[in-house]
Curated annotation (Swiss-Prot):
Protein name: Myoneurin
Cellular component terms per the entry's GO annotation: nucleoplasm
SUPFAM superfamilies to which the protein is assigned, alphabetical: beta-beta-alpha zinc fingers (SSF57667), POZ domain (SSF54695)
Sequence similarity: Belongs to the krueppel C2H2-type zinc-finger protein family.
PANTHER family reported for this sequence: KLUMPFUSS, ISOFORM B-RELATED (PTHR24404:SF114), ZINC FINGER PROTEIN (PTHR24404)
Region (Disordered): 156-199, 519-548
Length: 610
């Protein structure tokens, strides 16, 4: 028994593995962009990759940027893994160039067909105007046929330098004695008017289109009668055309419009075509059709098919799609960390260089990111906090803070430890939790050498050396080095004892006092793993969240447990670096790894980045 969707399912699973970087055994490098993939998949679709992997076992394949553009290769890679190829006037050339270089013949064929279509739209001939008007109604098609034949007759008269005594359009085939008499009377000319005027062929071609557009205003009953074969109606239509548009007037009109079409892009010809035939563009307007198509398509804002987000530019959408696909082409040459966008890499590099380009005008503090400066101004200089909780009406300086706060109400904990299964509301909390499993302590005090797993712990510890105590009790005026100590002190005023022993019911103001109690009184009893020393930092953090003080006081940015590098969303401007007061050691000194100097490749990388 054969399952019809088995191949699609296999390709879908391979694509998900590629996006997650799972089992990818090769990396395609184009300039500063890197694309992970599977060798067997690339070799199956591309003769170029098939030839390479027959002769080498290297994991990295470097492609020439002049031959293969990163955007074109990304679209090609998506086609290989999904079978979907979206071609438009913006990307077809890059995709064709990449497919031709990598020998993906199926895509080359599709691109050639598409480019021919775009070339036809950009430069149509006047005789092919009917191909553009695919949805013209039947009566307008009949007008076009009749008038073209009429114009062909005029051309033949000009070429022979004589006027036919009884001219008649070829499309009007039926004959009657009455119509012959009327046609003869209508078309006969006086001797003084018998001289033919010879015009250039391109003017006559333009006159044909002019006739077609103008006669689209003719009454529908006349045209319907022509289609049904009514001889008198044919004559009536011909008479209307002759009387309304004499040959001399047509040529004069076309000549004038050809002279002024550059200065008057929206001429009367366009008005006629738009009002009568909505899908038709005149040859004058199609002269620069490529630019007009780009302008028309640019008015429709590009939208992400995955999440529905709308962007102002196609380039913004391409950058956004890297988030869904897991592509991180920007790599830090100092530590190897990869990022989705270039501005994220630049911000990250400031953790190595210590650069702080954004200065506060009120207190002269410097920040690595503009969003940090905005956050600082809202927290410390009275600027409005625009993000308000719908449940408790608390206001926040950033949307990310509001999002994290909302999880207290919803109970959502989306971040799960893959080692023990514990869940967390913040990604940073999960990061610090994992370090308890690994024992990693990357933040080292330059003064005493003590190491910490959390950056905020190092900042708080450094205040012991500097003597800084930025947190002040609003009741007694006593100052403290951290918000946790301030909250602990505040309980002495309120009498709150949030830490309760589950064995005997005693309560305490501090988690340390609870642990001392358990050690002395319940030393022979099995300890509750939730009250272990390993969870000290989390319990202390929970105490800050449960404290009534946190409802009235703003948490200092330096106590926000945020990781060094988080993906920057367009809505969630998360902080990449903790903000410290001017008296404390600079955060670049605290957070940087102790590096004596940069190697030459690293210096080149920094120069190219800026």
């Amino acid at each position: 028994m054969q399952y019809s969707h088995h191949c699609e399912h296999l390709l879908e699973r391979l694509n998900k593995q590629r996006e997650a970087g799972f089992l990818c055994d090769c990396t395609v490098v184009i300039g500063e962009f890197q694309f992970k993939a599977h060798r067997n998949v690339l070799a199956s679709f591309s003769e170029y990759f098939g030839a390479i992997y027959r002769s080498t076992s290297e994991n990295n394949v470097f492609l020439d940027q002049s031959q293969v553009k990163a955007d074109g290769f990304q679209k090609l890679l998506e086609f290989i893994y999904t079978g979907t190829l979206n071609l438009d006037s913006w990307n077809v050339k890059e995709i064709h160039q990449a497919a031709d270089y990598l020998k993906v013949e199926e895509v080359v064929t599709k691109c050639k067909i598409k480019m021919e279509d775009f070339a036809f739209i950009a430069s149509p001939s006047s005789t092919e105007i009917s191909s553009i008007t695919g949805n013209i109604e039947l009566n307008q098609q009949a007008c076009l046929l009749t008038l073209r034949d009429y114009n062909n007759r005029e051309k033949s008269e000009v070429s022979t330098d004589s006027v036919q005594a009884n001219p008649k359009p070829r499309a009007l085939t039926k004959k009657s004695s009455q119509s012959k008499k009327k046609k003869k009377a209508f078309s006969s000319q006086k001797p003084g008017q018998s001289k033919a005027v010879q015009y250039p062929s391109d003017v006559l071609e333009s006159a044909s289109v002019e006739l077609f557009l103008e006669t689209s205003k003719l009454s529908s009953p006349v045209v319907e009668q022509i289609i049904q074969g009514n001889d008198s109606s044919e004559l009536e239509l011909t008479s209307v055309v002759e009387n309304t548009f004499p040959t001399q007037d047509i040529v004069q009109t076309v000549t004038v419009k050809r002279k002024r079409r550059k200065s008057q892009s929206h001429c009367a010809l366009k008005e006629h075509s738009m009002s009568n035939i909505a899908s038709v563009k005149s040859p004058y307007e199609l002269e620069n059709a490529g630019e007009e198509l780009d302008a028309r398509f640019s008015k429709a804002k590009p939208m992400c098919n995955t999440c529905g987000k709308v962007f102002s530019e196609a380039s913004s959408l391409r950058r956004h799609m890297r988030i869904h696909k897991g592509v991180k082409p920007y790599v830090c040459h100092l530590c190897g960390k990869a990022f989705t966008q270039c501005n994220q890499l630049k911000t990250h590099v400031r953790t190595h260089t210590g650069e702080r380009p954004y200065k506060c005008e009120l207190c002269d503090k410097g920040f690595a990111q503009k969003c940090q400066l905005v956050f600082h101004s809202r927290m410390h200089h009275g600027e409005e906090k625009p993000y308000k909780c719908d449940v408790c009406n608390l206001q926040f300086a950033t949307s990310s803070n509001l999002k994290i706060h909302a999880r207290k109400h919803s109970g959502e904990k989306p971040y799960v430890c893959d080692r023990c299964g514990q869940r967390f509301a913040q990604a940073s909390t999960l990061t610090y939790h994992v370090r308890r499993h690994t024992g990693e302590k990357p933040y080292v005090c330059d003064t005493c050498g003590k190491a910490f797993a959390v950056s905020s712990s190092l900042i708080t510890h450094s205040r012991k050396h500097t003597g800084e105590k930025p947190y002040i009790c609003g009741i007694c005026g006593k100052s403290f080095i951290s918000s946790g100590e301030l909250n602990k002190h505040f309980r002495s005023h309120t009498g709150e004892r949030p830490f309760i022993c589950e064995l005997c019911g005693n309560s305490y103001t501090d988690i340390k006092n609870l642990k001392k109690h358990k050690t002395k009184v319940h030393s022979g009893t099995d300890k509750n793993p939730d009250c272990s020393v390993d969870d000290h930092a989390v319990s202390e953090q929970d105490s800050v969240q449960r404290s009534p003080l946190s409802e009235t006081l703003d948490v200092k940015p330096s106590d926000m447990t945020l990781p060094l590098a988080l993906p920057l969303g367009t809505e969630d401007h998360q902080m990449l670096l903790p903000v410290t007061d001017s008296q404390s050691p600079a955060s670049d000194t605290l957070l940087r790894s102790t590096v004596n100097g940069y190697s030459e490749p690293q210096l080149i990388f920094l120069q190219q980045l800026y």
